[in-house]
Design a protein with these regions (language model features):
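Active-site-adjacent structural elements in enzyme catalytic cores
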Residues: 1-213
Length: 213
């Protein structure tokens, strides 16, 4: 199998959404790097993402949403601290980690009981998730341990034989990936440094933000 290259217009986005809803995996541009989209509720599709990336199954996959109202069925609760963060930093490169709904597949959460969510500010990513009509995976479109991809050629070189399609949105901004912030504890913790600095989050929250590890 070789991935189809789809133009990131209405027709290509519609085709990509159909591929995802049929259990396929599609690479698409975000405001940082290319991501891999699959149906978050389809176990076979999730397994395909793990195989394509060579990713260890204990590592969870983050999800992309089109709207904050989609959160309710994915998490146990929405902490008050998360409300302000979503209001100010979504859409954008901030992934928030919540206590996962027990209905989510274990493969998605990596058995951690938590799930990472964000809304991308990239118009193609937004349009794709909206067209699919439900949460999709948003993990980076690269082999595990390799640099993230900001060009279609890089995605194709690493994953072209393992995924179904690539939505060609041109070169992405690159830089740093999304900042990953765990909001499940008493004090927010940055799990992964990224495009939004910890100092900016701490300033907004008016409290210290822990770093882990």
């Amino acid at each position: 199998m070789k991935a189809s290259i789809l133009k990131a217009g209405p027709r290509g986005i519609a085709r990509a959404s159909r591929i995802i809803l049929r259990g396929g995996v599609v690479a698409f541009p975000t405001e940082t790097f290319y991501g891999l989209g699959a149906d978050a509720g389809n176990i076979q599709a999730l397994e395909k993402v793990f195989r394509a990336k060579g990713r260890e199954e204990h590592k969870p996959l983050l999800l992309l949403l089109a709207d904050r109202t989609w959160i309710s069925g994915l998490v146990k609760e929405i902490p008050m601290v998360a409300e302000g963060l979503m209001e100010n930093f979504w859409p954008g490169p901030l992934t928030l980690i919540f206590e996962a709904s027990p209905h989510l597949p274990l493969l998605l959460t990596g058995g951690t009981g938590k799930v990472g969510l964000r809304i991308s500010s990239h118009p193609v990513a937004q349009a794709l998730v909206q067209k699919v009509g439900q949460a999709i995976t948003g993990t980076s479109a690269n082999l595990s341990g390799q640099p993230s991809a900001s060009l279609v050629a890089e995605v194709f070189r690493g994953l072209g034989g393992e995924i179904d399609a690539i939505l060609d949105g041109g070169q992405t901004a690159g830089g740093l990936g999304s900042t990953v912030l765990d909001v499940t504890g008493e004090r927010p913790r940055i799990i992964r440094r990224g495009a939004i600095p910890g100092s900016q989050l701490a300033s907004f929250l008016g409290k210290k933000v822990d770093f882990f590890p």
